[in-house]
UniProtKB/Swiss-Prot annotation:
This is 50 kDa cell wall protein. It comes from the Eukaryota. It comes from Nicotiana tabacum. The lineage of its organism: Eukaryota, Viridiplantae, Streptophyta, Embryophyta, Tracheophyta. One of its GO terms (cellular component) is extracellular region. Keywords: Cell wall, Secreted. It is found in: Secreted, Cell wall.
Length: 10
């Protein structure tokens, strides 16, 4: 999941 700051949370 690309979130607001730019990254992945899995």
């Amino acid at each position: 999941n690309p979130q607001y700051p730019x990254g992945n949370v899995q």
